[in-house]
Design a protein with these regions (language model features):
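Long, low-complexity intrinsically disordered regions
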Residues: 396-401, 407
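Intrinsic low-complexity/disordered segments
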Residues: 14-16, 399, 436, 440-441
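A general lysine-centric signal
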Residues: 2, 334, 477-480
Protein backbone atom coordinates (compact mmCIF):
# COMPACT_ATOMS: atom_id res chain seq x y z
CA UNK A 1 0.00 0.00 0.00
CA UNK A 2 0.99 3.57 -0.53
CA UNK A 3 0.88 6.00 2.36
CA UNK A 4 0.90 9.75 2.36
CA UNK A 5 4.09 10.99 3.99
CA UNK A 6 4.54 14.70 4.52
CA UNK A 7 8.13 15.68 5.31
CA UNK A 8 8.92 19.04 6.82
CA UNK A 9 11.99 20.62 5.32
CA UNK A 10 13.67 23.93 4.80
CA UNK A 11 13.01 25.40 1.33
CA UNK A 12 15.93 24.53 -0.91
CA UNK A 13 16.62 24.68 -4.60
CA UNK A 14 16.47 21.00 -5.43
CA UNK A 15 18.47 20.11 -8.51
CA UNK A 16 17.22 16.52 -8.34
CA UNK A 17 13.62 17.54 -8.92
CA UNK A 18 12.37 17.51 -12.50
CA UNK A 19 9.07 19.37 -12.36
CA UNK A 20 10.68 22.46 -13.89
CA UNK A 21 12.55 20.55 -16.58
CA UNK A 22 10.53 21.58 -19.64
CA UNK A 23 10.26 25.20 -20.76
CA UNK A 24 8.01 26.77 -23.40
CA UNK A 25 8.52 30.49 -23.94
CA UNK A 26 9.08 33.27 -26.47
CA UNK A 27 8.12 32.72 -30.10
CA UNK A 28 7.54 28.94 -29.98
CA UNK A 29 10.89 28.37 -28.28
CA UNK A 30 11.53 25.58 -25.81
CA UNK A 31 14.11 23.73 -23.73
CA UNK A 32 14.11 20.25 -22.20
CA UNK A 33 16.45 19.73 -19.21
CA UNK A 34 15.63 16.07 -18.56
CA UNK A 35 18.98 14.85 -19.89
CA UNK A 36 20.85 17.14 -17.48
CA UNK A 37 21.71 19.66 -20.20
CA UNK A 38 19.21 21.78 -22.13
CA UNK A 39 17.95 20.30 -25.40
CA UNK A 40 16.16 22.67 -27.77
CA UNK A 41 12.51 21.75 -28.48
CA UNK A 42 9.96 23.59 -30.60
CA UNK A 43 6.75 21.61 -30.08
CA UNK A 44 4.98 23.99 -27.70
CA UNK A 45 2.07 26.34 -28.30
CA UNK A 46 3.47 29.39 -26.48
CA UNK A 47 4.18 32.14 -29.01
CA UNK A 48 3.49 35.66 -30.19
CA UNK A 49 -0.22 36.50 -30.29
CA UNK A 50 -2.37 39.15 -31.89
CA UNK A 51 -3.36 41.81 -29.37
CA UNK A 52 -5.53 43.84 -31.75
CA UNK A 53 -6.06 46.73 -31.93
CA UNK A 54 -2.68 47.19 -30.21
CA UNK A 55 -0.61 44.95 -32.49
CA UNK A 56 1.38 41.80 -31.71
CA UNK A 57 2.00 41.07 -28.04
CA UNK A 58 5.58 40.56 -26.95
CA UNK A 59 6.15 37.04 -25.61
CA UNK A 60 7.02 37.60 -21.95
CA UNK A 61 5.43 35.31 -19.37
CA UNK A 62 4.44 31.63 -19.28
CA UNK A 63 4.20 28.84 -16.71
CA UNK A 64 4.76 25.08 -16.95
CA UNK A 65 4.71 22.09 -14.65
CA UNK A 66 5.92 18.52 -15.13
CA UNK A 67 5.53 15.44 -12.98
CA UNK A 68 8.28 14.05 -10.78
CA UNK A 69 9.78 12.15 -13.72
CA UNK A 70 10.04 15.29 -15.84
CA UNK A 71 7.07 14.45 -18.07
CA UNK A 72 4.95 17.42 -19.07
CA UNK A 73 1.61 17.88 -17.28
CA UNK A 74 0.37 21.22 -18.65
CA UNK A 75 1.41 24.79 -19.37
CA UNK A 76 -0.03 28.27 -19.83
CA UNK A 77 0.75 31.64 -21.45
CA UNK A 78 -1.67 33.65 -19.30
CA UNK A 79 -4.65 33.45 -21.65
CA UNK A 80 -4.68 29.73 -22.58
CA UNK A 81 -3.76 26.51 -20.78
CA UNK A 82 -2.59 23.50 -22.81
CA UNK A 83 -2.42 19.86 -21.74
CA UNK A 84 0.50 17.49 -22.21
CA UNK A 85 -0.66 16.75 -25.76
CA UNK A 86 -0.38 20.47 -26.61
CA UNK A 87 -4.15 20.75 -26.97
CA UNK A 88 -6.19 23.43 -25.24
CA UNK A 89 -7.02 22.01 -21.84
CA UNK A 90 -10.64 21.35 -20.95
CA UNK A 91 -12.07 24.79 -20.04
CA UNK A 92 -8.54 26.16 -20.53
CA UNK A 93 -9.29 29.09 -22.82
CA UNK A 94 -10.28 32.70 -22.02
CA UNK A 95 -8.01 33.16 -19.02
CA UNK A 96 -7.75 36.83 -18.12
CA UNK A 97 -4.13 37.63 -18.89
CA UNK A 98 -1.86 37.51 -21.94
CA UNK A 99 1.67 36.42 -22.75
CA UNK A 100 2.55 40.13 -22.79
CA UNK A 101 2.50 40.22 -18.98
CA UNK A 102 6.03 39.97 -17.54
CA UNK A 103 5.05 37.10 -15.24
CA UNK A 104 1.67 36.26 -16.71
CA UNK A 105 1.12 33.04 -14.80
CA UNK A 106 2.37 30.71 -12.08
CA UNK A 107 1.39 27.08 -11.45
CA UNK A 108 1.43 25.85 -7.85
CA UNK A 109 0.45 22.35 -6.69
CA UNK A 110 -2.13 22.36 -3.93
CA UNK A 111 -0.24 21.34 -0.79
CA UNK A 112 -0.82 17.72 0.11
CA UNK A 113 -2.55 16.96 -3.19
CA UNK A 114 -1.39 15.02 -6.22
CA UNK A 115 -4.47 16.05 -8.16
CA UNK A 116 -5.19 19.77 -7.83
CA UNK A 117 -3.14 22.71 -9.07
CA UNK A 118 -3.67 26.45 -8.71
CA UNK A 119 -3.04 28.54 -11.83
CA UNK A 120 -2.45 32.19 -10.92
CA UNK A 121 -2.50 34.99 -13.52
CA UNK A 122 -1.59 38.69 -13.56
CA UNK A 123 -2.95 40.95 -16.27
CA UNK A 124 -0.81 43.00 -18.65
CA UNK A 125 -0.65 46.70 -19.42
CA UNK A 126 -0.24 46.36 -23.20
CA UNK A 127 -3.49 44.64 -24.20
CA UNK A 128 -5.70 45.04 -21.13
CA UNK A 129 -4.34 48.07 -19.26
CA UNK A 130 -4.25 45.90 -16.09
CA UNK A 131 -8.05 45.81 -15.94
CA UNK A 132 -8.41 42.12 -14.98
CA UNK A 133 -6.06 42.09 -11.99
CA UNK A 134 -4.75 39.05 -10.10
CA UNK A 135 -6.82 35.88 -10.46
CA UNK A 136 -6.64 32.14 -10.02
CA UNK A 137 -8.18 29.00 -11.49
CA UNK A 138 -8.12 25.47 -10.06
CA UNK A 139 -7.05 22.59 -12.27
CA UNK A 140 -8.03 18.98 -11.64
CA UNK A 141 -5.43 16.90 -13.46
CA UNK A 142 -7.81 13.91 -13.42
CA UNK A 143 -10.41 15.55 -15.66
CA UNK A 144 -10.61 14.67 -19.36
CA UNK A 145 -9.20 11.17 -18.86
CA UNK A 146 -6.09 12.42 -17.08
CA UNK A 147 -5.31 15.30 -19.42
CA UNK A 148 -6.61 17.77 -16.86
CA UNK A 149 -9.03 20.65 -16.95
CA UNK A 150 -10.11 23.78 -15.13
CA UNK A 151 -12.94 23.01 -12.72
CA UNK A 152 -16.26 24.62 -13.60
CA UNK A 153 -16.91 27.54 -11.27
CA UNK A 154 -13.23 27.69 -10.23
CA UNK A 155 -11.96 29.82 -13.11
CA UNK A 156 -10.70 33.42 -13.24
CA UNK A 157 -11.52 34.02 -9.56
CA UNK A 158 -10.47 37.53 -8.55
CA UNK A 159 -8.03 38.01 -5.68
CA UNK A 160 -6.89 41.62 -6.22
CA UNK A 161 -7.65 44.26 -8.81
CA UNK A 162 -5.00 46.38 -10.55
CA UNK A 163 -1.71 44.68 -9.79
CA UNK A 164 1.63 45.00 -11.55
CA UNK A 165 2.86 42.26 -13.89
CA UNK A 166 4.94 40.79 -11.02
CA UNK A 167 4.13 37.33 -9.66
CA UNK A 168 6.23 34.87 -7.69
CA UNK A 169 5.95 32.26 -4.96
CA UNK A 170 7.84 31.02 -1.90
CA UNK A 171 7.59 27.80 0.09
CA UNK A 172 6.17 28.44 3.56
CA UNK A 173 8.47 27.84 6.53
CA UNK A 174 6.33 24.81 7.45
CA UNK A 175 7.63 23.09 4.32
CA UNK A 176 4.11 22.37 3.09
CA UNK A 177 2.24 25.55 2.17
CA UNK A 178 3.17 28.30 -0.31
CA UNK A 179 3.15 32.08 -0.31
CA UNK A 180 1.98 33.59 -3.61
CA UNK A 181 3.26 37.16 -3.92
CA UNK A 182 2.16 40.08 -6.09
CA UNK A 183 2.66 43.85 -5.99
CA UNK A 184 -0.23 46.29 -6.03
CA UNK A 185 -0.08 48.89 -8.81
CA UNK A 186 0.20 52.59 -7.89
CA UNK A 187 1.16 51.44 -4.39
CA UNK A 188 4.06 50.26 -2.25
CA UNK A 189 2.10 47.19 -1.11
CA UNK A 190 3.10 43.56 -1.43
CA UNK A 191 0.14 41.19 -1.14
CA UNK A 192 1.14 37.70 0.02
CA UNK A 193 -1.46 34.91 -0.21
CA UNK A 194 -0.98 31.69 1.70
CA UNK A 195 -1.99 28.55 -0.19
CA UNK A 196 -2.65 25.52 2.02
CA UNK A 197 -4.27 22.14 1.51
CA UNK A 198 -7.64 23.80 2.06
CA UNK A 199 -7.08 26.64 -0.40
CA UNK A 200 -6.13 30.28 0.03
CA UNK A 201 -6.46 30.90 3.74
CA UNK A 202 -4.55 34.06 4.58
CA UNK A 203 -3.48 37.38 3.06
CA UNK A 204 -0.60 39.47 4.41
CA UNK A 205 -0.07 43.04 3.14
CA UNK A 206 3.30 44.76 3.59
CA UNK A 207 3.81 48.43 2.72
CA UNK A 208 7.52 48.72 1.99
CA UNK A 209 9.74 50.00 -0.81
CA UNK A 210 8.87 52.24 -3.73
CA UNK A 211 5.44 53.07 -5.06
CA UNK A 212 4.97 51.59 -8.52
CA UNK A 213 3.53 54.72 -10.08
CA UNK A 214 0.98 55.63 -12.69
CA UNK A 215 2.65 58.05 -15.09
CA UNK A 216 -0.15 60.03 -16.69
CA UNK A 217 -2.58 57.53 -18.19
CA UNK A 218 0.17 55.01 -18.85
CA UNK A 219 0.32 51.71 -16.96
CA UNK A 220 3.55 50.53 -18.57
CA UNK A 221 5.27 51.09 -15.24
CA UNK A 222 3.75 47.73 -14.21
CA UNK A 223 6.45 45.72 -16.01
CA UNK A 224 9.54 43.98 -14.61
CA UNK A 225 10.24 40.75 -12.75
CA UNK A 226 9.78 39.87 -9.07
CA UNK A 227 11.76 36.91 -7.73
CA UNK A 228 12.37 35.15 -4.44
CA UNK A 229 15.67 33.63 -3.36
CA UNK A 230 15.73 29.81 -3.34
CA UNK A 231 15.83 29.76 0.47
CA UNK A 232 12.72 31.96 0.58
CA UNK A 233 14.34 34.68 2.70
CA UNK A 234 14.81 37.47 0.13
CA UNK A 235 12.72 39.14 -2.56
CA UNK A 236 13.94 41.35 -5.39
CA UNK A 237 12.12 43.35 -8.03
CA UNK A 238 12.82 45.80 -10.82
CA UNK A 239 10.84 48.39 -12.75
CA UNK A 240 12.71 50.10 -15.56
CA UNK A 241 9.78 52.06 -16.96
CA UNK A 242 9.24 54.08 -13.79
CA UNK A 243 10.82 57.51 -13.34
CA UNK A 244 13.13 57.10 -11.54
CA UNK A 245 13.77 53.42 -12.25
CA UNK A 246 13.26 50.93 -9.40
CA UNK A 247 15.62 48.12 -8.38
CA UNK A 248 15.21 46.83 -4.83
CA UNK A 249 15.64 43.79 -2.63
CA UNK A 250 13.93 42.94 0.65
CA UNK A 251 13.86 40.54 3.56
CA UNK A 252 11.00 38.05 3.45
CA UNK A 253 9.73 36.10 6.45
CA UNK A 254 8.40 32.88 4.95
CA UNK A 255 6.70 32.03 8.23
CA UNK A 256 4.60 35.20 8.57
CA UNK A 257 4.54 36.41 4.94
CA UNK A 258 5.90 39.84 5.93
CA UNK A 259 8.15 41.79 3.53
CA UNK A 260 10.57 44.24 5.19
CA UNK A 261 13.91 46.07 5.09
CA UNK A 262 14.06 47.46 1.57
CA UNK A 263 17.48 48.11 0.02
CA UNK A 264 17.66 50.14 -3.20
CA UNK A 265 20.30 48.99 -5.67
CA UNK A 266 19.22 51.42 -8.37
CA UNK A 267 22.45 53.09 -9.48
CA UNK A 268 21.06 55.06 -12.42
CA UNK A 269 17.51 56.50 -12.45
CA UNK A 270 17.30 56.22 -16.25
CA UNK A 271 18.26 52.57 -16.62
CA UNK A 272 15.67 50.20 -18.07
CA UNK A 273 15.67 47.30 -15.62
CA UNK A 274 13.60 44.24 -16.55
CA UNK A 275 14.97 40.90 -15.29
CA UNK A 276 16.09 39.69 -11.87
CA UNK A 277 17.30 36.37 -10.41
CA UNK A 278 19.12 35.00 -7.37
CA UNK A 279 21.96 32.49 -7.49
CA UNK A 280 21.21 28.95 -6.27
CA UNK A 281 23.15 29.55 -3.03
CA UNK A 282 21.23 32.83 -2.38
CA UNK A 283 24.44 34.88 -2.21
CA UNK A 284 24.29 36.74 -5.53
CA UNK A 285 21.60 38.87 -7.14
CA UNK A 286 21.53 39.46 -10.89
CA UNK A 287 19.72 42.30 -12.64
CA UNK A 288 19.24 42.67 -16.40
CA UNK A 289 18.86 45.97 -18.25
CA UNK A 290 17.75 46.76 -21.77
CA UNK A 291 18.03 50.02 -23.72
CA UNK A 292 19.59 52.42 -21.19
CA UNK A 293 22.26 50.62 -19.17
CA UNK A 294 21.99 47.48 -21.26
CA UNK A 295 23.82 44.70 -19.48
CA UNK A 296 23.59 42.07 -16.75
CA UNK A 297 24.87 43.16 -13.34
CA UNK A 298 25.79 41.08 -10.31
CA UNK A 299 25.39 42.21 -6.69
CA UNK A 300 27.10 40.25 -3.91
CA UNK A 301 24.54 40.06 -1.10
CA UNK A 302 27.20 38.76 1.29
CA UNK A 303 29.52 41.76 0.77
CA UNK A 304 30.39 43.47 4.05
CA UNK A 305 28.35 40.90 5.92
CA UNK A 306 25.29 41.97 3.94
CA UNK A 307 25.78 45.69 4.61
CA UNK A 308 23.63 47.55 2.02
CA UNK A 309 26.38 50.03 1.13
CA UNK A 310 28.82 47.19 0.50
CA UNK A 311 26.25 45.27 -1.53
CA UNK A 312 25.63 48.26 -3.83
CA UNK A 313 29.38 48.81 -4.15
CA UNK A 314 29.84 45.19 -5.24
CA UNK A 315 27.98 45.80 -8.51
CA UNK A 316 29.82 44.09 -11.37
CA UNK A 317 28.97 44.12 -15.06
CA UNK A 318 29.04 40.48 -16.17
CA UNK A 319 27.45 40.88 -19.63
CA UNK A 320 27.12 44.00 -21.71
CA UNK A 321 26.41 43.77 -25.43
CA UNK A 322 22.68 43.39 -26.01
CA UNK A 323 19.36 44.49 -24.59
CA UNK A 324 19.04 41.99 -21.76
CA UNK A 325 15.60 41.12 -20.45
CA UNK A 326 14.26 38.12 -18.54
CA UNK A 327 16.41 35.99 -16.22
CA UNK A 328 15.51 32.52 -14.97
CA UNK A 329 17.26 29.99 -12.75
CA UNK A 330 17.01 26.45 -14.17
CA UNK A 331 17.21 23.01 -12.60
CA UNK A 332 20.80 22.66 -13.86
CA UNK A 333 21.85 25.47 -11.49
CA UNK A 334 22.48 27.98 -14.28
CA UNK A 335 20.72 31.27 -14.97
CA UNK A 336 19.37 31.76 -18.49
CA UNK A 337 19.31 35.20 -20.09
CA UNK A 338 16.92 36.52 -22.76
CA UNK A 339 19.21 38.67 -24.91
CA UNK A 340 16.82 40.67 -27.09
CA UNK A 341 13.08 40.98 -27.70
CA UNK A 342 13.40 41.03 -31.46
CA UNK A 343 12.31 38.22 -33.76
CA UNK A 344 15.38 36.77 -35.43
CA UNK A 345 17.55 36.82 -32.31
CA UNK A 346 17.35 33.12 -31.52
CA UNK A 347 20.16 32.86 -28.98
CA UNK A 348 20.16 32.69 -25.20
CA UNK A 349 22.90 33.79 -22.84
CA UNK A 350 23.81 31.63 -19.84
CA UNK A 351 25.38 32.49 -16.48
CA UNK A 352 27.17 29.17 -16.03
CA UNK A 353 28.46 29.55 -12.44
CA UNK A 354 26.07 32.02 -10.78
CA UNK A 355 27.34 31.35 -7.24
CA UNK A 356 30.77 32.73 -8.15
CA UNK A 357 31.66 36.38 -7.55
CA UNK A 358 32.14 38.88 -10.37
CA UNK A 359 33.04 37.78 -13.86
CA UNK A 360 33.99 34.33 -12.55
CA UNK A 361 30.25 33.64 -12.75
CA UNK A 362 31.16 32.72 -16.35
CA UNK A 363 28.57 34.40 -18.52
CA UNK A 364 28.46 32.82 -21.99
CA UNK A 365 26.85 34.89 -24.71
CA UNK A 366 24.91 33.14 -27.49
CA UNK A 367 25.27 29.90 -25.54
CA UNK A 368 22.14 28.24 -26.92
CA UNK A 369 20.70 28.49 -30.44
CA UNK A 370 16.91 28.12 -30.33
CA UNK A 371 16.77 27.06 -33.99
CA UNK A 372 15.34 30.31 -35.26
CA UNK A 373 12.80 30.79 -32.46
CA UNK A 374 13.24 34.01 -30.51
CA UNK A 375 13.18 34.06 -26.72
CA UNK A 376 11.59 37.50 -26.91
CA UNK A 377 11.35 39.01 -23.38
CA UNK A 378 11.18 36.21 -20.89
CA UNK A 379 10.96 32.64 -19.64
CA UNK A 380 8.53 30.38 -17.78
CA UNK A 381 7.74 31.47 -14.25
CA UNK A 382 8.66 28.95 -11.54
CA UNK A 383 8.95 28.93 -7.76
CA UNK A 384 12.71 28.58 -7.34
CA UNK A 385 12.25 27.00 -3.90
CA UNK A 386 9.96 24.27 -5.23
CA UNK A 387 10.47 20.81 -3.82
CA UNK A 388 7.48 19.45 -5.74
CA UNK A 389 7.57 16.39 -3.50
CA UNK A 390 3.80 15.98 -3.70
CA UNK A 391 3.58 16.42 -7.48
CA UNK A 392 2.56 13.07 -8.95
CA UNK A 393 1.74 12.39 -12.57
CA UNK A 394 -0.49 9.39 -11.97
CA UNK A 395 -4.26 9.67 -11.90
CA UNK A 396 -5.33 6.06 -11.67
CA UNK A 397 -8.92 6.58 -10.64
CA UNK A 398 -9.78 9.82 -12.40
CA UNK A 399 -12.55 11.80 -10.72
CA UNK A 400 -13.75 10.35 -7.46
CA UNK A 401 -16.89 8.45 -8.30
CA UNK A 402 -20.09 9.09 -6.39
CA UNK A 403 -20.01 5.52 -5.09
CA UNK A 404 -16.58 6.18 -3.57
CA UNK A 405 -17.73 9.43 -2.00
CA UNK A 406 -20.76 7.72 -0.48
CA UNK A 407 -18.44 5.22 1.21
CA UNK A 408 -17.16 7.95 3.53
CA UNK A 409 -19.21 9.09 6.48
CA UNK A 410 -17.97 11.73 8.94
CA UNK A 411 -20.00 12.24 12.11
CA UNK A 412 -21.25 13.85 14.20
CA UNK A 413 -21.30 17.22 12.43
CA UNK A 414 -21.18 19.49 14.39
CA UNK A 415 -18.86 17.52 16.69
CA UNK A 416 -17.62 18.14 20.21
CA UNK A 417 -15.42 15.61 22.04
CA UNK A 418 -15.30 12.85 19.40
CA UNK A 419 -15.10 12.78 15.61
CA UNK A 420 -15.62 9.57 13.67
CA UNK A 421 -14.62 8.59 10.13
CA UNK A 422 -16.28 5.55 8.60
CA UNK A 423 -14.93 4.43 5.21
CA UNK A 424 -16.69 1.43 3.65
CA UNK A 425 -13.62 0.07 1.93
CA UNK A 426 -11.25 -2.61 3.12
CA UNK A 427 -8.19 -0.61 2.06
CA UNK A 428 -6.15 1.56 4.36
CA UNK A 429 -6.76 5.30 4.11
CA UNK A 430 -5.11 8.39 5.52
CA UNK A 431 -7.24 11.13 7.01
CA UNK A 432 -5.93 14.63 7.75
CA UNK A 433 -7.73 17.38 9.64
CA UNK A 434 -6.81 21.06 9.26
CA UNK A 435 -7.90 24.15 11.15
CA UNK A 436 -8.96 27.35 9.40
CA UNK A 437 -5.33 28.54 9.29
CA UNK A 438 -4.39 25.49 7.27
CA UNK A 439 -2.45 23.93 10.15
CA UNK A 440 -2.72 20.16 10.30
CA UNK A 441 -4.08 19.16 13.71
CA UNK A 442 -4.63 15.46 13.02
CA UNK A 443 -3.30 12.81 10.67
CA UNK A 444 -4.03 9.12 11.08
CA UNK A 445 -4.03 5.92 9.03
CA UNK A 446 -7.01 3.60 9.47
CA UNK A 447 -9.05 0.85 7.86
CA UNK A 448 -12.84 1.09 7.72
CA UNK A 449 -13.39 2.99 10.97
CA UNK A 450 -11.67 5.56 13.16
CA UNK A 451 -12.88 7.59 16.12
CA UNK A 452 -10.63 10.22 17.65
CA UNK A 453 -10.79 12.38 20.75
CA UNK A 454 -11.18 16.07 19.86
CA UNK A 455 -11.49 17.66 23.29
CA UNK A 456 -8.22 19.53 22.76
CA UNK A 457 -9.44 21.26 19.59
CA UNK A 458 -10.77 24.81 19.73
CA UNK A 459 -14.27 25.54 18.50
CA UNK A 460 -14.49 26.46 14.83
CA UNK A 461 -14.47 25.12 11.28
CA UNK A 462 -12.13 22.26 10.33
CA UNK A 463 -11.37 20.75 6.95
CA UNK A 464 -10.78 17.05 6.40
CA UNK A 465 -9.07 15.25 3.54
CA UNK A 466 -9.12 11.51 2.90
CA UNK A 467 -6.67 9.62 0.67
CA UNK A 468 -6.29 6.01 -0.29
CA UNK A 469 -3.72 4.20 -2.39
CA UNK A 470 -5.70 4.99 -5.55
CA UNK A 471 -4.88 8.68 -5.05
CA UNK A 472 -8.60 9.31 -4.53
CA UNK A 473 -9.11 12.58 -2.70
CA UNK A 474 -12.27 13.33 -0.74
CA UNK A 475 -12.63 16.59 1.14
CA UNK A 476 -15.14 18.29 3.35
CA UNK A 477 -15.59 20.46 6.40
CA UNK A 478 -16.92 19.93 9.88
CA UNK A 479 -17.77 22.24 12.75
CA UNK A 480 -16.45 21.93 16.31
CA UNK A 481 -18.87 23.27 18.91
CA UNK A 482 -19.05 23.23 22.70
CA UNK A 483 -18.93 20.10 24.87
CA UNK A 484 -21.77 17.66 24.33
CA UNK A 485 -24.25 17.31 27.14
CA UNK A 486 -24.62 13.85 28.63
CA UNK A 487 -28.22 12.63 28.49
CA UNK A 488 -29.77 10.94 31.51
Amino acid sequence: KKFLIIILFLPLFCFGQKQGNIWYFGDHAGLDFNSGSPVVINNGQVGLIDCSPFGTCHAEGSAIICDSSGALLFYCDGSTAWNKNHQIMLNGDSLLSTISSTQSSLIVPQPGSSRYFYLFTTDDFFAHNLQYGFRYSIIDICLDNGLGGIINGEKNLLLLDTVTEKLTGVRHANGVDYWIIVHKFHSDAFHCYRLSSTGIIDTVISHVGSVHPIEGANTWTAVGQLKASPNGQKLALVNGNATPAIAEYFDFDNNTGIVSNVVSIQTNPLWSYYGVSFSPDNSKLYIACNLNGNGVYQFDLSAGGGNPTAVVASKTLVAGTYNYLGLQLATDGKIYVARSPFVGNSYLGVISSPNNAGTSCNYVDAAIDLNGHAASYGFPNFIDSYDYSNTVSKCETGIAEQSDIEKLKVFPNPFSTQLTFSYADNEQAVVSLYNFLGQRVLQQTFTNYMSTNTEQLANGIYFYELRNDKVTVMKGKVLKQGQEKTSR
